[in-house]
């Protein structure tokens, strides 16, 4: 018998009818499973991706299920800021006066080619971090009072600090380093967003999570041949999850009552997990936040009136240390 992500997450009996959720990168992998789960729970789901045929298939699957869920598909290339803005606009229209209840920042991947986007930013960093940052910033005023922002990160975030000078160059490019840097940015972004919202007495929460190593997602399509072949065998190992299992933590953070007031934290397997020391550094989180606005050429979101970023208490502490290597797609 198939076990759905919402059942694994312990929220299979919840109903979130009249709520709206955006799941980016939801035409395959854990994004698709997350979108289907939220649809089964009754939400109106904005499905996002670049493959229109795959997107329509997810919409049909949600609307064909025996529940009250509905869906629509919006195509957007996350390497293009204008398309991210169009996705934000379409989501705003879908949410209406009730606001957006759930934002799952899941789109991303592992890209082995050294290249810059049209904005002059290293491609992996732009797609995996800068576009989720932009999308979230553009939707801040459209979030419901108790909305939840969930960002797919990875245990792959553990590594060197982010060198801001590397973000606009591809000299000595390393695909793994680019991926690791983008995943560290995901954890730092989620923590900083949580802090800035909390400093404004907002009930909106922001958390990140590690989904597990998932060969069934689209992560491995960009790996070099030998690595891709080796990765394909990971699905036979017991510590590697399926897309449905990987989606369970996203669904848990989006729906479960017990985390309604939890913000700025990092999760794995539906439990808080301590991220890297660098990921917890509030100064590094603040620098990334400010640099991201500069790279996009926009005003700093949620900037304090006096120009400061608020308190310096670190987010993401606590939890267990188990979990396998992760990816987002």
Regions found by a protein language model. Give the residues of each.
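C-terminal helical subdomain
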Residues: 182, 208, 232-273, 282-283
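Short, amphipathic alpha-helical "lid/cap" segments that border enzyme active or binding sites
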Residues: 27, 85-88, 243-254, 282-289, ...
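C-terminal helix-and-tail extensions that cap enzymatic domains
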Residues: 21, 263-266, 273-329
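A short, mixed-charge helix-start or loop-turn motif at secondary-structure junctions
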Residues: 24, 171, 175, 232-236, ...
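A glycine/serine/threonine-rich, flexible loop-to-helix segment
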Residues: 215-232
């Amino acid at each position: 018998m198939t076990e759905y992500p919402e059942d694994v997450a312990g929220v299979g009996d919840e109903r979130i009818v009249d709520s709206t959720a955006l799941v980016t990168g939801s035409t395959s992998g854990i994004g698709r499973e997350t979108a289907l789960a939220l649809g089964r729970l009754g939400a109106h789901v904005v499905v996002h991706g670049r493959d229109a045929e795959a997107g329509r298939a997810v919409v049909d699957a949600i609307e064909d299920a025996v529940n009250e869920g509905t869906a629509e598909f919006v195509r957007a290339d996350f390497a293009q800021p204008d398309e991210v803005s169009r996705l934000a606009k379409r989501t705003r229209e879908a949410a209406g006066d009730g606001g957006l209840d759930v934002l799952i920042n899941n789109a991303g991947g592992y890209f082995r080619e050294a290249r810059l986007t049209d904005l002059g930013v290293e491609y992996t960093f732009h797609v995996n971090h800068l576009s989720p940052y932009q999308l979230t910033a553009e939707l801040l005023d459209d979030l419901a009072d108790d909305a939840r922002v969930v960002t797919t990160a990875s245990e792959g975030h553990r590594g060197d600090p982010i060198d801001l000078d590397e973000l606009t160059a591809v000299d000595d490019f390393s695909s793994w380093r680019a991926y690791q840097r983008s995943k560290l940015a995901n954890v730092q972004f989620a923590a900083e967003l949580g802090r800035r919202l909390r400093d404004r007495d907002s009930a909106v929460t922001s958390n990140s999570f590690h989904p597990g190593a998932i060969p069934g997602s689209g992560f491995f399509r960009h790996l070099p041949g030998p690595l891709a072949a080796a990765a394909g065998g990971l699905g036979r190992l017991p510590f590697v999850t399926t897309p449905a299992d990987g989606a369970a933590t996203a669904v848990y953070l989006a729906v479960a009552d017990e985390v309604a007031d939890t913000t700025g934290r990092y999760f794995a397997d539906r439990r808080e997990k301590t991220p890297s020391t660098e990921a917890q550094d509030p100064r590094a989180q603040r620098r990334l936040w400010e640099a991201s606005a500069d790279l996009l050429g926009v005003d700093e979101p949620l900037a304090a009136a006096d120009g400061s970023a608020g308190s310096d208490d670190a987010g993401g502490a606590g939890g267990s240390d188990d979990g396998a290597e992760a990816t987002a797609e």
